[in-house]
């Protein structure tokens, strides 16, 4: 991950977060993308989930070092593993695609470089989550 990617990601998430319905839109897209996903979220408080997601996005962005962030990712990965929530690895790719789709809708400066930055910034965290399944 390059410094420029982190900068683009950070600026983009700030633009998206200016609108309170950004993460709601993401969850609408994500839940509609798969029956499996919809079932996983059947009894979930989506407002609480959206707050946790925003925190997790920043943690994933900066998970390349600081031990407390890595500890958070470890906890998150354990929770999502086959022994707890059983989030299958292929669902993370769908998650990222729907997240970037929501970003495209909400970030007025979205372009191919922004798309690539979101993917490069989040990919290490996603790969970590998949590896702990």
Predicted segments with their positions:
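Globin-like tetrapyrrole-binding proteins
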Residues: 1-133
């Amino acid at each position: 991950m390059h410094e420029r990617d982190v900068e683009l990601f950070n600026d983009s998430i700030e633009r998206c977060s200016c609108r309170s319905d950004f993460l709601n839109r993401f969850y609408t897209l994500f839940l509609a993308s798969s029956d499996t996903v919809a079932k996983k979220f059947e009894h979930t408080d989506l407002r609480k989930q959206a707050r946790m997601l925003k925190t997790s996005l920043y943690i994933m962005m900066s998970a390349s070092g600081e031990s407390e962030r890595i500890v958070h990712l470890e906890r998150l990965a354990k929770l999502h593993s086959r022994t707890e929530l059983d989030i299958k690895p292929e669902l993370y790719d769908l998650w990222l695609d729907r997240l970037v789709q929501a970003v495209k809708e909400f970030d007025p400066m979205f372009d191919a470089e922004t798309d690539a930055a979101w993917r490069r910034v989040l990919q290490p965290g996603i790969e970590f989550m998949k590896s702990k399944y």
